[in-house]
């Protein structure tokens, strides 16, 4: 704030704008999203030439607002601000903000299920980042790639990435935040592999993947300590959410809910949305369990609603079902809505895991859905729950 005051007093518009936008970025990292957006708006006013087109240096403020709007799940507004910020930053030769703006574009494409456009944008960002030497952006793009591959069920490619970069994950030569992002990408691979093994090959769930979850949780403990020590609350929330997913994959629901509860308590005052819903169906299961336990019920219900709204590939809810569910299928569906895993449903109903999977597949087929979140949303719209 002192640099803002001094540069403003000296009439240095560019320095004032840069210092103000930098303050907004710091506030965002501290988890103060509402303060950050107000700071970026102040920067926009500084960059405004009496109602004419803003000066190129205002691009950094536009991109900052775009990132916050994305977190709040206002995708259309995020696109608008990102594109404006990219255009201004290109005019001003500010490559770092061009990269940040295009990162928002990649995230929005991913959120909308536009996989091809997301991959293409990631490729463009990677090329530019490599050309100009931005290791953090390269690590950020790797994480987005991992999320896209996992969403596609392409664990082979994600696992190959993990093998290829295993040495660099512990490379102390890269900047700390890039190192953190790489480790987060690695954790995502380990969680996805474990969840896949638990659902497809239950007899192997406790063998190599148990060790992988120990590795993932070990990485997350280190990351959490670093983020807490430096006051980066936004990273703390993200890491806690991943911790919850890792504990869930390990079968430790108590620890999973504890980590999720901490994340929600930090996130609720600032209205975080995408940090949670970008994790997809595994997070939806945890959120349903949190709602059932009365943890931040209003906030969690809103997150679940955002998740269900984002299931664009689901059917129109007004369409009636052509074939009704059996009593057993309804029973399974209610347990799914309560957040129980396949294994927990099997124990609850005293049936084989394969039978649970068969019932769930029948439910999906009859309801015309592809995921638990879509099934629960459809059932709620039809008054079945």
Predicted features and spans:
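Transmembrane helices and adjacent periplasmic/lumenal helix-loop junctions
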Residues: 13
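Helix-turn-helix DNA-binding segment
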Residues: 308, 312-361, 365-370, 374-385
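Helix-coil-helix junctions within alpha-helical repeat/solenoid scaffolds
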Residues: 1-10, 19-314, 359
């Amino acid at each position: 704030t002192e640099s803002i005051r001094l540069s403003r007093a000296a009439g240095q518009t560019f320095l004032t704008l840069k210092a103000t936008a930098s303050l907004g970025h710091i506030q965002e990292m501290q988890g103060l999203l509402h303060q950050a957006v107000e700071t970026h708006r102040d920067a926009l006013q500084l960059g405004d030439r009496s109602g004419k087109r803003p000066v190129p240096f205002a691009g950094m403020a536009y991109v900052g607002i775009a990132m916050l709007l994305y977190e709040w799940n206002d995708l259309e507004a995020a696109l608008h601000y990102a594109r404006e910020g990219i255009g201004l930053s290109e005019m001003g030769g500010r490559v770092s903000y061009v990269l940040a703006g295009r990162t928002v574009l990649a995230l929005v494409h991913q959120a909308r299920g536009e996989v091809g456009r997301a991959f293409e944008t990631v490729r463009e960002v990677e090329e530019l980042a490599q050309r100009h030497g931005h290791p953090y952006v390269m690590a950020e793009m790797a994480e987005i790639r991992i999320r896209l591959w996992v969403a596609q069920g392409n664990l082979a490619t994600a696992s190959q990435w993990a093998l290829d970069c295993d040495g660099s994950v512990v490379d102390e030569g890269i900047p700390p935040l890039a190192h953190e992002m790489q480790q987060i990408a690695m954790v995502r691979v380990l969680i996805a592999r474990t969840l896949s093994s638990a659902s497809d090959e239950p007899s192997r769930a406790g063998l190599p993947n148990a060790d992988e979850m120990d590795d993932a949780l070990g990485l997350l403990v280190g990351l959490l300590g670093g983020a807490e020590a430096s006051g980066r609350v936004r990273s703390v929330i993200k890491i806690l959410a991943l911790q919850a997913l890792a504990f869930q994959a390990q079968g430790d629901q108590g620890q999973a809910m504890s980590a999720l509860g901490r994340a929600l308590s930090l996130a609720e005052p600032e209205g975080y949305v995408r940090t949670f819903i970008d994790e997809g169906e595994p997070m939806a299961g945890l959120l349903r369990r949190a709602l059932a336990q009365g943890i931040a019920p209003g906030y969690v219900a809103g997150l679940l609603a955002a998740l269900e709204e984002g299931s664009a590939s689901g059917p129109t809810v007004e369409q009636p079902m052509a074939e009704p569910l059996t009593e057993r299928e309804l029973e399974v569906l209610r347990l799914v809505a309560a957040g129980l895993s396949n294994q927990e449903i099997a124990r609850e109903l005293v049936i084989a895991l394969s039978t649970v999977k068969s019932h769930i597949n029948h439910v999906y087929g009859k309801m015309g859905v592809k995921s638990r979140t879509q099934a629960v949303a459809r059932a709620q719209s039809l008054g079945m729950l």
